[in-house]
């Protein structure tokens, strides 16, 4: 490579005024973009042989002139930074079949060090010793003249660095120094290389491409020009532009940007991040809910529920709350001073549902949430007369304080028969094939007292979607307390109980406990 430097005359000294007298067309383009011939140098005898007709045109010369009028600055970093504007040229006059090598170097424009003060550049001292010059060879080299003339020749991958120990081949520069890029066109030898003293080459210099290397932009006009013309200069844009860009991207999705000071929109809105999860649990309303009370309130929510689970699954929460008590506590927002209204509008019919704010429910799948709502359903038998009229569905709507955690062990769901059967004797329920229930050890478990009557909540009935033991002082039944499968009633076991030994509770589907005394 040392021979190449000697052959090209790529001295590392500052670029002198007579340095423009290069072997071939090296003068800058005229107003029409055509370079003019320069006086011949002593090497013109052999260096210009076959190179005299080559012409080079700088691409985007008008943009380079805009920067040059202000004072072009190029950022240098330790990792390396690309130039903007990019160095691109159009080459003509090459032999289509001859192979050429195109390369660049960047040499000091003078021996001064600069500083930017009072909104202008001024000389502040002598330049630091120049680093050993590096050549950047175009990746397509060597290539035929037809290849180079077919399209623009771009050096946009060239990077500038201030790391004197750079191992990546980037051009090493000093900050606050002025530099001049140069383009060299070399005719490849028989080995598709260059470096010998007899290598034919020519050099082209465009003064408008000179720049001062900086680690950060000094002139705000240069910064503005970079922003206006470089689509990748996002890091220099103002905070207002970045905020508007961020908000526009956020609003294009389903997650709206809602300021903290404003009242949040309805959860049932289509733009709510919870709308997709809620619709999985919805019935006929916009949002729906699996939390509805069965105290005479009919709803179509059971249509989307899966088949009942014959055995209750273990639950961590064993507290059973009375449905009427929960409705009174949830709907009396005035009794709790720390509850804040969620929406200022009055509840409507489409908002007549409970909102669940239990944090562990949000990360579950839709099917698991539905099953968990079944397992946690609180059976309300209406055994005791209510002390006050039952509130309507609008009265028990709890839209006003969804921030309060819900009682996960006392969720309420509408229970209606999935497929009502005609009245028949007790034995018919057990002798029919598809209606054999799985009653686990009914004789070994005493039923809890509910009011004055004795009722037993069975684990499963053919027309009962939700099964749960619900007594004032009993917990949830776990699978460990159930009997083995051999104790289940089967087709061959005769049942001789008569209809007068049991009665039904309307709308609930509960079977009473029977004994010899009844």
From Swiss-Prot:
SMART domains registered for this protein in UniProt: TBOX (SM00425)
A single GO BP: heart development
Keyword Nucleotide-binding in record: no
Any single Gene Ontology cellular-component annotation: protein-containing complex
Effect noted on mutating residue 234 to R: Does not affect acetylation of the protein
UniProt modified residues of type N6-acetyllysine: 339
Chief location bin: nucleus
Gene3D superfamilies: Transcription factor, T-box
Location of the protein in the cell: Nucleus; Cytoplasm
Compositional bias of kind Polar residues: 262-301
Listed Basic and acidic residues bias regions: 15-28
UniProt keyword list: Acetylation, Atrial fibrillation, Cardiomyopathy, Cytoplasm, Developmental protein, Disease variant, DNA-binding, Nucleus, Transcription, Transcription regulation
Record's comment on post-translational modification: Acetylation at Lys-339 by KAT2A and KAT2B promotes nuclear retention.
Portion annotated as DNA-binding: 58-238
Low complexity bias: start-end ranges: 34-45
Coiled-coil region(s): none
Quaternary structure and interacting proteins, as annotated: Monomer. Homodimer (via the T-box); binds DNA as homodimer. Interacts (via the T-box) with NKX2-5 (via the homeobox); this complex binds DNA. Interacts with GATA4. Interacts with KAT2A and KAT2B.
Function: DNA-binding protein that regulates the transcription of several genes and is involved in heart development and limb pattern formation. Binds to the core DNA motif of NPPA promoter.
Disease connection: Holt-Oram syndrome: Developmental disorder affecting the heart and upper limbs. It is characterized by thumb anomaly and atrial septal defects. Defects in TBX5 are associated with susceptibility to heart disorders including dilated cardiomyopathy (DCM) and atrial fibrillation (AF). DCM is characterized by ventricular and impaired systolic function, resulting in heart failure and arrhythmia. Patient are at risk of premature death. AF is a common sustained cardiac rhythm disturbance. AF is characterized by disorganized atrial electrical activity and ineffective atrial contraction promoting blood stasis in the atria and reduces ventricular filling.
Domain notes: The T-Box domain binds to double-stranded DNA.
Protein name per UniProt: T-box transcription factor TBX5
UniProt source species: Homo sapiens (Human)
Native organism taxonomy: Eukaryota, Metazoa, Chordata, Craniata, Vertebrata
């Amino acid at each position: 490579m040392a021979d190449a430097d000697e052959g090209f005359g790529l001295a590392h000294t500052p670029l002198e005024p007579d340095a423009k007298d290069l072997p071939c067309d090296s003068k800058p383009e005229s107003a029409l973009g055509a370079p003019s011939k320069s006086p011949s140098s002593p090497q013109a005898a052999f260096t210009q042989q076959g190179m005299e007709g080559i012409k080079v045109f700088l691409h985007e010369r008008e943009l380079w002139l805009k920067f040059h009028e202000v004072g072009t600055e190029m950022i240098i970093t330790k990792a390396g930074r690309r130039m903007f504007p990019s160095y691109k040229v159009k080459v003509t006059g090459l032999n289509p079949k001859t192979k050429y090598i195109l390369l660049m170097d960047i040499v000091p424009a003078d021996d001064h060090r600069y500083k930017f003060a009072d909104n202008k550049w001024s000389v502040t001292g002598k330049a630091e010793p120049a680093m050993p010059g590096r050549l950047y060879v175009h990746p397509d080299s060597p290539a035929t003249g037809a290849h180079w003339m077919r399209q623009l020749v771009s050096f946009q991958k060239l990077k500038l660095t201030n790391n004197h120990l750079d191992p990546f081949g980037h051009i090493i520069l000093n900050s606050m120094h002025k530099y001049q890029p140069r383009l060299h066109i070399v005719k490849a030898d028989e080995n598709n290389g260059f470096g010998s003293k007899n290598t034919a080459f020519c050099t082209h210099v465009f003064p408008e491409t000179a720049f001062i290397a900086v680690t950060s932009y000094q002139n705000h006009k240069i910064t503005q020009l970079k922003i206006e013309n470089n689509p990748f200069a996002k890091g220099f844009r103002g905070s207002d532009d970045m905020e508007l860009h961020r908000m526009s991207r956020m609003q294009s999705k389903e997650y709206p940007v809602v300021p903290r000071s404003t009242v949040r929109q309805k959860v049932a809105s289509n733009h709510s991040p919870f709308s997709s999860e809620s619709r999985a649990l919805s019935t006929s309303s916009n949002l729906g809910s699996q939390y509805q009370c069965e105290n005479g309130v009919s709803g179509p929510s059971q249509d989307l529920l899966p088949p009942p689970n014959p055995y209750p699954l273990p639950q961590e929460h064993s507290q059973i709350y009375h449905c009427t008590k929960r409705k009174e506590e949830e709907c009396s927002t005035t009794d709790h001073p720390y509850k804040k209204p969620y929406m200022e509008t009055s509840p409507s019919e489409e908002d007549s549902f409970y909102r669940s704010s239990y944090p562990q429910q949000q990360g579950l799948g839709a099917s698991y949430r539905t099953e968990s709502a079944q397992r946690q359903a609180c059976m309300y038998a209406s055994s005791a007369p209510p002390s006050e009229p039952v509130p309507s569905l609008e009265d028990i709507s709890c839209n006003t304080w969804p921030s309060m955690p819900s009682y996960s062990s006392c969720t309420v769901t509408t229970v209606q028969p999935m497929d009502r059967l005609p009245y028949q004797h007790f034995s018919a329920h057990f002798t029919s094939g598809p209606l054999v229930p799985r009653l686990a050890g009914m004789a070994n478990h005493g039923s809890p007292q509910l009011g004055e009557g004795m009722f037993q909540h069975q684990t499963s009935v053919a027309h009962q979607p939700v099964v749960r033991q619900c007594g004032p002082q009993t917990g949830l039944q776990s699978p460990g307390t159930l009997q083995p499968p051999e104790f289940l009633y089967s087709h061959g076991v005769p049942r001789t109980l008569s209809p007068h030994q049991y009665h039904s509770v309307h709308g609930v589907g509960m079977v009473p406990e029977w004994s010899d005394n009844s």
